[in-house]
Amino acid sequence: MALARGSRQLGALVWGACLCVLVHGQQAQPGQGSDPARWRQLIQWENNGQVYSLLNSGSEYVPAGPQRSESSSRVLLAGAPQAQQRRSHGSPRRRQAPSLPLPGRVGSDTVRGQARHPFGFGQVPDNWREVAVGDSTGMARARTSVSQQRHGGSASSVSASAFASTYRQQPSYPQQFPYPQAPFVSQYENYDPASRTYDQGFVYYRPAGGGVGAGAAAVASAGVIYPYQPRARYEEYGGGEELPEYPPQGFYPAPERPYVPPPPPPPDGLDRRYSHSLYSEGTPGFEQAYPDPGPEAAQAHGGDPRLGWYPPYANPPPEAYGPPRALEPPYLPVRSSDTPPPGGERNGAQQGRLSVGSVYRPNQNGRGLPDLVPDPNYVQASTYVQRAHLYSLRCAAEEKCLASTAYAPEATDYDVRVLLRFPQRVKNQGTADFLPNRPRHTWEWHSCHQHYHSMDEFSHYDLLDAATGKKVAEGHKASFCLEDSTCDFGNLKRYACTSHTQGLSPGCYDTYNADIDCQWIDITDVQPGNYILKVHVNPKYIVLESDFTNNVVRCNIHYTGRYVSATNCKIVQS
C-alpha cells in the first residue's frame, strides 16, 4: 500500500517536471533571440594599458526598414578608468555635448551644417554651457528617452545625454545675470519637452577594474542607453604628478580677482614713466631737480626715479620732476654785426633750442644750423658723355635744362644733343635741418617729372675754360626736390620728395644719379679741350648755413669730342 502510494507520487512529480519543461520551452521559443538582458556582441581594445569593452545586446545584423521601439537594444561602454580621488572638486571638468535628434531622424544621425560646436557636429541643447560631465568621484549620470512613433510610424528617435543637474557646479558668487544662451537654440524649439528633462533615477556605475564584467552595469527604465565616458586623463593612469589646485572658473570673474580701479591720470596728462633723457645730466640744476633718493627710496618706489624705474601702470611721484620751463619765442637767425645785449649769450643759448628748422642738436649751446657739403669723389666716379635726340629731352626742355640753341626755331626733334653727365651727392653735416626757402604753397609742380620743386636754385652747374676761367657752356639752375636719400648710421630718414615733406636731415644725403633728367651740362656747342667743371650748392646763400666755404666742387675735365675724363675733383672755397 505504501509502495504503491510512493510510486504514484513519484510519477506525478515526473509528469509535472516534464510539463514545466515543455511549457517553459514553448514560452522561450518566440523570444529566444531577443532577450534584452543578454550581451550578444563584445568588442575589446586596449589604449595606454587600459582595456575598454563595448557590449551590445542586439543582433549583429539589423534588417532594413523601420525598427520597433520594443526591439531596441542596449549598448554599454565599460572599462573606463577610475578617476583618482586626489583630484579636488574644483578642478576643471570636461563638457560633453550630446546630439539631439530632429523629428524624423534616428538618434544616431547628426545634422551637418545646421549647428557647429567646439565638440563636433550635431545638435546642442540650450543648457550645454552650464552642465559638466563626470566628476572627481568617478560617477556620471545619464538619461534616455524614447519617442514612440513620431510623425505617424516613423523610426523611433533615441537621445542619450550625459548631463545631470546634480553635478551642476554652483558658483560661489551671486548670480546677477542669466547664463548666456547659444545662438542656435531657437532652431530646436520643436523638440519634445520631455527630452530636456533629467531622469534622476538613472545612475551609471563606473567599474573599479578594467575587465569586461568587472561590475559594469547600467539600469535604465527605457532600456536604451549611450553612456559616453570622457577620455581618461594622463594623471588618471597614475603617471601624472600632483596638479596644483586652481579655483573654479566660470563665465564671470572669480572672487580672487577683485576689481582694481585705474590710477588717476597725472595733472598735466603726460605719461612720464619713460621720459628719462640721456642729455639731462649735463644741464645745470640736474642734481637739484633730481636729488639722490638713496637705497631706501629706491626700494620703496621700485628703483631710481631718475631712470624711470617705476612699477607698471603707476604714476611717478610728482616731486621727482622739476617745474616746467616757460615757452620762449623762436630764434630767427640773421647775420648782423651788432653787439649782443647784456645776457645775450645765455638768451641765445636758450633760444637756439627752438630755432626754426632745428631738430637734432647734441650741443645745447649752439644755434643749430645746417651745413651742406657736396661729395667730390662721387662726381669724379662717373662722369661721361651722352648723345640723345631732342625728342627724348622734352621734359628737360620744359625745365630749361638745355642750351639756347635747342630752343631755336630751326631746331627739330631729330637733332642730337651732346650732354656732359655727372652725379651729385650732398650731405648735411650740420646740426639742423636744411629746409626749402620757399613757402609750401608756392612750390612749383612739374607735371612731366611728377614732383614739386621747393627751391628755385639749389645747385649751379657750370663749365669753365681751364686757361681763362670763363664760361664756355651755358649752365643751368638745378631746382630739384629735396629729400633724404640715404643717412649715416644712427640717423633716420624723415624727408621725401612729396608735396609737404621736403628737406635734408642732419647726417643724411641728397643723391642725384647721373642718369636722371637735368643732371648734366649741354656741351653740344663746346669744342674739345681742357675744362673745369664747377658744382655749387646753395649758390646764392639763401638758406643760412654754419659754413659756406665748403659748398663748391671743382674737377678737371678733358674732352676729346667723343668721350670725357674727370680728374682732381676737390672742394674749394669758390
From Swiss-Prot:
Cofactor note: Contains 1 lysine tyrosylquinone.
2',4',5'-topaquinone sites (modified residues): 512
Domain of life: Eukaryota
Region (Lysyl-oxidase like): 370-574
Disulfide-bond pairs as recorded: 395-401, 448-497, 481-487, 508-518, 555-569
Signal peptide interval: 1-25
Chain spans, region Interaction with FBLN5: 311-369
Associated disease: Exfoliation syndrome: A disorder characterized by accumulation of abnormal fibrillar deposits in the anterior segment of the eye. In addition to being a cause of glaucoma and glaucomatous optic neuropathy, exfoliation syndrome has also been associated with lens zonule weakness, cataract formation, and systemic vascular complications due to deposition of exfoliation material in extraocular tissues.
Quaternary structure and partners: Interacts (via propeptide) with EFEMP2. Interacts with FBLN5.
Protein name: Lysyl oxidase homolog 1
Natural source organism: Homo sapiens (Human)
